[in-house]
Amino acid sequence: TYSGNPIACAAALGTLDTYKEEGLLTRGEELAPYWEDALHSLKGEPNVIDIRNIGLIGAIELAPIPGSPTKRAFSAFVKAFERGALIRTTGDIIALSPPLIITKGQINE
């Protein structure tokens, strides 16, 4: 089994050390309001039904295309991928969770 594997535990501890040394969790807290404002600025855009978030995790619900559920979100996925961004879709919802090292400039993009 992989439970309690010493190598995996060492990697996890190293990751936690990096989070602490680089202040990544604090950085996430500091960027959360900026992220929220940027995300919610999309309200009123065509086909946007709802926007929700907590911290640096967000979701944009899109109006489904009649007779083609999930197509609108999948099209957004493809366009984002072509531009170098990775998003996740569930139905007609786009899920976003940027890395903790994201900059305000990158959020603006």
Task: Name what the model sees in each region.
Residues 1-109:
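Conserved N-terminal phosphate-binding loop of PLP-dependent enzymes in the Aspartate aminotransferase
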